[in-house]
């Protein structure tokens, strides 16, 4: 009589994903309100330190966006950014990203020429570089690397997928609606503190076109890799020339 083979341990049940439009709405509305609050504080003289202003200009957007992504993933989702929001990279994403980033930056530059009569008016304006840790973080890492990671996780990860899942339509239609909504919200967050009507439509049009292209490649591939590379290129083509100017 042979001993019975012990049964393999049962795999833990998959976590039930409960994130959706409410998580995305909290992040987007929170970012808009904090941007407006920071703009009000700056205009009323409560913020005077240039470095503090520059740091807050990033944090008021990043904190609510990244916070909503992390809450959705680790408290209400699968605890995997790859499964929940497509944070994956394939070598082909490099080609997607370079192409989209270059083309959308050209389109955004055409909007600048139409609105201002020249390129670069809406780009970065930087003082003489100090080449210290602050300069490296605020002038290079923040706009070129950190912003693409956080913003793509939210806009093309959480928001796009939440809208697609909530749209009562066939998948191609749901994805098209989700791409348009994510691009609109992306543009809105970038123009909520626009200083003039011209800046409003120039920046709004450029960011909407980029957002639509990034959302489309994400919808096609199911990954954020291409959108993140495109975002790095799109921002880098503004920041790097400003640094070399």
Q: Where are the model-predicted features located?
A:
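Non-cytosolic membrane-interface motifs at loop->transmembrane helix junctions
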Residues: 49-58, 126-128, 198-209
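Transmembrane helix-loop-helix hairpins at the membrane interface
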Residues: 109, 134-245
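Membrane-interface interhelical connector segments
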Residues: 116-133, 159, 165
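Helix-boundary and loop/linker segments of multi-pass membrane transporters
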Residues: 17, 86-90, 125-135, 170-172
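Interfacial segments of alpha-helical transmembrane regions
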Residues: 86-103, 176, 182
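Alpha-helical membrane-spanning segments of integral membrane proteins, especially the hydrophobic core
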Residues: 93-101, 128-144
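N-terminal, membrane-interfacial amphipathic/helix-forming hydrophobic leader that caps
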Residues: 1-92, 105, 109, 113, ...
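Transmembrane alpha-helix/helix-exit interface in multi-pass inner-membrane proteins
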Residues: 101-121, 149-156
């Amino acid at each position: 009589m042979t001993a019975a083979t012990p049964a393999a341990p049962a795999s833990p049940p998959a976590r039930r994903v409960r994130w959706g439009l409410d998580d995305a709405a909290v992040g987007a509305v929170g970012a808009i309100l904090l941007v407006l609050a920071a703009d009000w504080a700056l205009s009323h003289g409560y913020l005077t330190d240039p470095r503090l202003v520059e740091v807050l200009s990033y944090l008021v957007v990043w904190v609510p966006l990244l916070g909503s992504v992390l809450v959705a993933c680790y408290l209400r989702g699968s605890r995997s950014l790859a499964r929940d929001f497509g944070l994956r990279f394939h070598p082909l994403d490099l080609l997607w990203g370079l192409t989209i980033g270059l083309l959308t930056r050209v389109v955004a530059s055409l909007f600048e020429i139409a609105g201002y009569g020249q390129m670069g008016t809406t780009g970065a304006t930087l003082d003489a570089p100090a080449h210290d840790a602050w300069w490296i973080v605020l002038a290079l890492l923040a706009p070129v690397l950190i912003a693409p990671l956080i913003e793509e996780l939210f806009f093309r990860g959480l928001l796009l997928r939440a809208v697609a899942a909530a749209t009562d339509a066939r998948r191609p239609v749901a994805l098209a609606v989700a791409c348009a909504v994510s691009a609109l919200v992306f543009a809105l967050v970038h123009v909520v503190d626009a200083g003039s009507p011209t800046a409003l439509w120039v920046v709004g049009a450029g960011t909407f076109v980029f957002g639509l292209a990034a959302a489309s490649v994400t919808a096609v591939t199911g990954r954020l890799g291409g959108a993140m590379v495109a975002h790095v290129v799109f921002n880098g083509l503004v920041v790097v020339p400003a640094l070399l100017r």
